[in-house]
Amino acid sequence: ILIFLSIFLLNSVLAFGSYIDTDAKTAVVIDGTTGKVLFEKNKDEKTFPASMTKIMTTLIVFEKLSNGTLSLDDTFLVSERAWKEREGSSMFVEVDKNIRVEDLLRGIIVQSGNDACIVVAENIAGTEESFAKMMNEKAIDIGMTNTNFTNSTGMHDKNNFSTAYDLAILSQYLINNYPEYYHMFAETEFEWSNIKQKNRNPLLYKNMGVDGLKTGHLSVSGYGLAASAIDGDRRVISVTNGFSSTQKRSQGSSRLITWSFREFENIRLFEDFTCLLYTSPSPRD
């Protein structure tokens, strides 16, 4: 008896063939389903991810929510160190207060709060340094071969680095494995401590199907953005870094996404029939 499994194999193919370039120093666009690279510019060049680091920070939390070791209603205590973290963006947590994991996630994803990242890191791993080790273990596990994390926030450290391609791998993994939590990345505002902040992802406010991920900026590496968009049944993921301004980041990233949807399409190449079981017929008497 032969049992076959029919597998539909997809491939992203160039439909029209127009050329595009970008002012970003490093960039990549991948198909969200197949992982195929649709565009690249220095995609494996080391860069400082800045707040795009927080994609991995949230991934660690999502993983623990998914396996049941955490719940959204669990609370984390704010340490003095986390409370004092006011460099860069902040959720404005208060020392010695207990904050729900769900609120901290929104503080990280929507408000890009460095303080919220430290609260999460310390409560999950004891110290931010130990949390960074967890981040690196996960990076290796999902195939990020040119990445090293030293903190949960993306604050500049010469040893906190990644590549556009590795960040695309990270983004694809998070989206595909944790759809029940990924929707938080599409939220456009969050209020905490009577301070309402808007999501820093500029493409969420454009009518182009973008539904999440993170911006990043450091003076040493410029402006970056990991963004994902849906058009019908297709998803693309764009990661750029090294733009000289927020305006160029927004325009450049949106151009790459629009181009990828216009110039590529997924087609079924063939059906692969895989033999699962073979049983020899019984001999006749």
Describe every region a protein language model picked out.
Residues M144-N148, H156-F161, Y165-S280, R284:
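Domain-terminus/edge residues, biased toward the C-terminal soluble/receptor-binding domains
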